[in-house]
């Protein structure tokens, strides 16, 4: 039986293995293995909400082990450190507990076909002090770590007698993650008052977004940037554009002009790069972001048994640009590779990948949602905001749940999430 390994259980990887399990795994036509360093999947566009504490993995997470049992594939917990394409094997680090004790030794897994869906991470560009003093939001563990630090700072500020000193939060990166996190944190400032912190309010927060480029949300149309800046301005979030960070210290971020942006909590949400093991894979070509360059079928040019999807996948478009690292890209790639792996098993022709940009949306907590619709959703680049934008934003997550759980369980999960939001706490205190 052919063994297919998928590395990474993010938006693309989990959807892919779910699709394959229906056609190959449950029918005993292939052995499917998903490898991820986390036990729980949370849709990456929601990680900033985990960090702020408005959702948690209990209600919005998918336990890989349980999902694997229900869908007929195998889950392996571990961090991949090397892919040996010559010998068609992957190598995992020893699995350690929180105290550093070994649970499982280093392992290696052989494959017949490999799909890398490992996602991406923020790029600190080697800026001194960033790794030591900043929080990142690339994984569930990192988001939960920031949330614990946020709770501690809110409690500390709530017990201070002087209201003049604010809780200072600085976020480097004016993309979707940075701007959405800023708005969500402002909302939390007011929400904390109802959850045992009577002296807290949004007025006691000082939130700054630091963007190196000339405008925030640089990948989106300028009209969206202007609407986003207006929404952030209304809730007193400071936006510093054309501001490069040269160093991070215990006091805050230092700009290339020598100014210090003081902060009690520092977040780095800038840049994109592929995981190191992806960059180290031999016999493949990488672009400047470390992504693996693939052919029209999302295979590496020198191997029909090696596919790449999601943020680690480099697909060059006719105009010379690259398919952007977004959830919608991963979703479309997962569908294409699932079709191709199933077609290969049946001896049928492969399907070339065609990226369709449906637009982008940015959700600023309860305050505003702005974006643009393209592709099949609109004949032109249509600007949307307000309720329509929020409806489309929510529908993106709905599509993901349906792809991961199927129609019935996906809809039940949505209903459960709605009931939980109505009856449960709006702010996570642990």
Question: What is each model feature region?
Answer:
Residues 7-8, 116, 172:
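Conserved N-terminal Rossmann-fold NAD(P)-binding element of oxidoreductases
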Residues 75-168, 267:
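FAD-binding core/adjacent interface of flavoenzyme oxidoreductases
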Residues 1-82, 179-219, 267:
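Beta1-alpha1 glycine-rich phosphate/pyrophosphate-binding loop at the start
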Residues 333, 338-430:
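C-terminal, flexible cofactor-proximal segment of oxidoreductases
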Residues 146-202:
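Rossmann-like NAD(P)H-binding beta-loop-alpha module
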Residues 132-160, 251-253, 260-332:
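FAD-site-proximal beta/loop scaffold in flavoenzymes
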Residues 29, 71, 75-94, 186-296, ...:
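A Rossmann-like FAD-binding core segment of flavoenzymes
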């Amino acid at each position: 039986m052919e063994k297919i390994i998928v590395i990474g259980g993010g938006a693309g990887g989990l959807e892919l293995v779910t699709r394959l399990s229906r056609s190959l795994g449950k029918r005993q036509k292939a052995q499917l293995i998903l490898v991820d360093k986390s036990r729980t999947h949370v849709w990456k566009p929601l990680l900033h909400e985990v960090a702020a504490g408005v959702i948690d993995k209990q209600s919005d997470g998918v336990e890989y082990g349980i999902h694997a049992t229900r869908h007929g594939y195998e889950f392996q917990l571990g961090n991949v450190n090397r892919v040996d394409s010559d010998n068609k094997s992957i190598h995992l680090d020893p699995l350690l507990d929180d105290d550093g004790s070994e649970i499982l030794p280093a392992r290696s897994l052989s494959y017949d076909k490999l799909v890398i869906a490992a996602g991406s991470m923020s790029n600190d560009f080697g800026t001194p002090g960033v790794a030591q003093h900043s929080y990142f939001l690339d994984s569930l563990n990192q988001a939960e770590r920031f949330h614990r630090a946020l709770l501690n700072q809110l409690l500390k500020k709530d017990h201070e007698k002087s209201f003049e000193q604010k809780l200072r939060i600085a976020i480097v990166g004016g993309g979707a993650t940075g701007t959405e996190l800023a708005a969500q944190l402002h909302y939390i400032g007011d929400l904390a008052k109802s959850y045992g912190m009577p002296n807290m309010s949004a007025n006691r927060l000082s939130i700054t977004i630091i963007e190196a480029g000339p405008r925030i949300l640089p990948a989106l149309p300028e009209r969206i940037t202007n609407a986003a800046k207006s929404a952030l301005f209304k809730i007193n979030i400071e936006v510093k554009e054309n501001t490069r960070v040269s160093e991070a210290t215990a006091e805050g971020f230092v700009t290339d002009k020598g100014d210090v942006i003081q902060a009690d909590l520092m977040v780095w949400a800038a840049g994109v790069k592929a995981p190191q093991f992806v960059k180290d894979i031999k016999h493949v070509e990488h672009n400047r972001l470390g992504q693996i360059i693939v052919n029209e079928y999302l295979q590496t040019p020198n191997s029909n048994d090696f596919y790449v999807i999601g943020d680690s996948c480099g697909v060059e478009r006719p105009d010379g640009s690259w398919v952007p690292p977004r959830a919608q890209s991963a979703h479309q790639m997962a569908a294409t590779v699932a079709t191709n792996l199933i077609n290969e098993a049946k001896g049928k022709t492969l399907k070339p990948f065609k990226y369709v940009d449906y637009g982008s949306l940015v959700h600023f907590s309860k305050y505003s949602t702005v974006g643009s619709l393209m592709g099949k959703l609109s004949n032109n680049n249509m600007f949307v905001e307000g309720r329509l934008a929020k409806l489309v934003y929510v529908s993106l997550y709905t599509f993901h749940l349906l792809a991961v759980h199927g129609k019935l369980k996906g809809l039940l999960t949505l209903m459960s999430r709605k009931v939980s939001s109505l009856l449960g706490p709006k702010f996570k205190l642990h």
